[in-house]
Amino acid sequence: PEPATGAFWSPAQLKGPNGLAIAFICNHCPYVVHMIDQWVAIAKKYQEKGIGFVAISANDVEKYPQDAPDAMVTFAQKHGFTFPYLYDETQEVALAYFAACTPDLAVFDAQNKCVYRGQFDGSRPQNDVPVSGQDLALALDALLAHAPPLPNQIPSIGCNIKWKPEKAPSYFIPKPKS
């Protein structure tokens, strides 16, 4: 559901006439905080071009209360979200999309085919590369131009999704405790 409204959304309701961009995010991850304002700017630009946007938080809020639904509402308001910010309490949506980290991005075309799964851009909290959203923007431009998907999609880097113990997927490898 969307904590701000209580509404439940389907992919069909979220998708624009030209596709859908999904970001698995959370409120506390430094990688998300680093890029979120540029993500919002790109969302505004491409929503006008018929691409739907959604952000989804799937973190375990018992262990990470800063990602709880009420904090999500505040985070979305603070950053001027123009799209739903959904809470995946069961973590089933994150599992269905093979989400691994925050931010984790995917773009789907109008026929629901995944045309991009990769990083927002080359900027990281610890480097001097400006936040631009270049990789995502190139993927969205290719989608709108009906061009083939970008051939070299670099995976997202960020904080691991905070899985509930019984939900951790087989593709998740936790850090060893030191």
What residue spans do the PLM features occupy?
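Chalcogenol-based redox active-site neighborhoods
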Residues: 1-144, 148-152, 167, 178
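Flexible coil segments in periplasmic/lumen-exposed cytochrome c-class electron-transfer proteins
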Residues: 153-177
